[in-house]
Amino acid sequence: MSMDIVERINKLKEEKNAVILAHNYQPKEIQKIADFLGDSLELCIKAKETDADIIVFCGVDFMGESAKILNPEKKVLMPEIEGTQCPMAHQLPPEIIKKYRELYPEAPLVVYVNTTAETKALADITCTSANADRVVNSLDADTVLFGPDNNLAYYVQKRTDKKVIAIPEGGGCYVHKKFTIDDLKRVKSKYPNAKVLIHPECSPELQDNADYIASTSGILRIVLESDDEEFIIGTEVGMINRLEIELEKLGKKKTLIPLRKDAICHEMKRITLEKIEKCLLEERYEIKLEKEIIEKAQKAIERMLRI
């Protein structure tokens, strides 16, 4: 009897001492076969801790790069590179950084991990949505440059006495920018008792009207630990898959309502089981970065991980 694709992937993983890391926004079938699921910070830490020879990263381009930066000696593969470029990660190129560095020469630059390796190499420190406020508050400066997500910068500004300068103007995630206050009113009218959980990449107006603002790992923790039964989830719809998987493991049932059903990151959905199998079989789409970029970007990420 021929093996099914999941069995074949598991066999290849074992043969090659490979590990599969998948972001919370990945399709459900990918989440189910991953060795580790998580948000950007959790996956950064897992990538650093793994003793596998090969890391297969199911996410978008900057995530694979981050895994390579933290594991320069390991082989980091992505099942797909065509169409997996996170648009926001490319909104803060070196020339924009140069302009703001000249305007604010004393201000440290904090960049979201949702950036390219080149951008991280120019930063003083990186952050994720799970630790952005802690990272900014750890810096010995009154003013910080923060990019590329303007909504995350707003979230941080509300939690620090420092002046946060959001760069570039209008930077952000196209998925989270879809959510509006009208969406919230519409869904809330149908589920008046539901708690509203949103990601800090959502607009200031939504942040000001949410019960909780959290990274995807924070959203998971709140849903699992809360006594509440209904939640409106304001982030990419793949997160609902992750929540359902974890609730099922605990034998719990809760009502999870997407703030918008079309909140889909198309770049995250490019990965399939077939592509993972081919990636392991051929060891294709390896992430390669210049040594100098790796060394500089590593300093910025390592500094974050020490906080």
From Swiss-Prot:
InterPro entries: NadA, NadA_sf, Quinolinate_synth_type2. Binds 1 [4Fe-4S] cluster per subunit. Its main location: cytoplasm. The keyword 4Fe-4S applies. Keywords: 4Fe-4S, Cytoplasm, Iron, Iron-sulfur, Metal-binding, Pyridine nucleotide biosynthesis, Transferase. [4Fe-4S] cluster binds at residues 86, 173, 265. Its EC number is 2.5.1.72. GO terms for molecular function: 4 iron, 4 sulfur cluster binding; metal ion binding; quinolinate synthetase A activity. Pathway: Cofactor biosynthesis; NAD(+) biosynthesis; quinolinate from iminoaspartate: step 1/1. It comes from the Archaea. The keyword Zinc does not apply. It catalyses: iminosuccinate + dihydroxyacetone phosphate = quinolinate + phosphate + 2 H2O + H(+). It is found in: Cytoplasm. Belongs to the quinolinate synthase family. Type 2 subfamily. Catalyzes the condensation of iminoaspartate with dihydroxyacetone phosphate to form quinolinate. NCBIfam families: nadA (TIGR00550), PRK09375.1-2 (NF006878). This is Quinolinate synthase. The gene is nadA.
